[in-house]
């Protein structure tokens, strides 16, 4: 039995109320969901709360899952949305439109690609140092594979703003790594 068939069977068992299937879903996806939430919230307790709430929502709305996307992707979207919702409640996040004129010039000018090897921990530290809006967009796109268009809709900002912030986040990470770990 392949992964998709196994996953689909697990979803169907959950839909029928099989408690063992709920347990299996939780143990299969909890860590992945926690990591996604942590990349947004940067707080273990809040991230754990969002995972719990997300599982409750997912199990309550299991009938709405249509197999158009993967079940794992569906769960990740729920926890990402819950995490962003918590941030909005707490901070009323401010998104500033950024000027796109210099970005094309930077890309065209280019820069020599210095080859560096960094540990996962060094990269995670550099990401954690980003301003919150940079960190969120970088993680959603680069780590959670959410499209830039979808990020724009989630955060209620323009696509070009997402693109610019992502580009600047990458540059800040690169700069941080080169300055810190040369």
Task: Name the predicted role of every residue range.
Residues 63-67, 77-97, 168:
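Arg/Lys-rich amphipathic alpha helix in sigma70-family domain 2
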Residues 3-4, 93-120:
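Internal acidic/polar
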Residues 35, 49-56, 69-81:
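Structural recognition of an alpha-helix C-terminal capping motif at a helix-to-coil junction
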Residues 15-16, 53-70, 90:
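Sigma70-family region 2
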Residues 125-136, 144-161:
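Helix-turn-helix DNA-binding module
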Residues 88, 130, 135, 170-182:
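Short, Lys/Arg-enriched C-terminal cap helix and immediately downstream tail that follows
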Residues 11-34:
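A short, charge-rich alpha-helical start-of-domain segment used by transcription regulators
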Residues 26-44, 61, 127, 172, ...:
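Amphipathic, Lys/Arg- and hydrophobic-enriched alpha-helical face
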């Amino acid at each position: 039995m392949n992964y998709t068939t196994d996953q689909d069977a697990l979803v169907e068992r959950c839909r029928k109320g099989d408690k063992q299937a709920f347990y299996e879903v939780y143990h299969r996806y909890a860590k992945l969901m926690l990591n996604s939430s942590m990349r947004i919230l940067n707080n273990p307790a809040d991230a754990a709360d969002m995972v719990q709430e997300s599982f409750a929502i997912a199990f309550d709305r299991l009938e709405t899952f249509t197999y158009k996307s993967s079940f794992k992707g569906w769960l990740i979207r729920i926890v990402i949305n819950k995490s962003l919702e918590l941030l909005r409640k707490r901070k009323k996040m401010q998104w500033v439109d950024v000027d796109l004129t210099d970005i094309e010039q930077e890309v065209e000018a280019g820069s020599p690609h210095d080859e560096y090897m960094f540990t996962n921990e060094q990269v995670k530290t550099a990401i954690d140092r980003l301003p919150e809006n940079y960190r969120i967009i970088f993680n959603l796109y680069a780590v959670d594979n959410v499209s830039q268009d979808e990020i724009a809709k989630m955060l209620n900002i323009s696509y070009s703003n997402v693109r610019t912030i992502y580009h600047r986040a990458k540059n800040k990470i690169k700069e941080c790594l080169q300055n810190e770990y040369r």
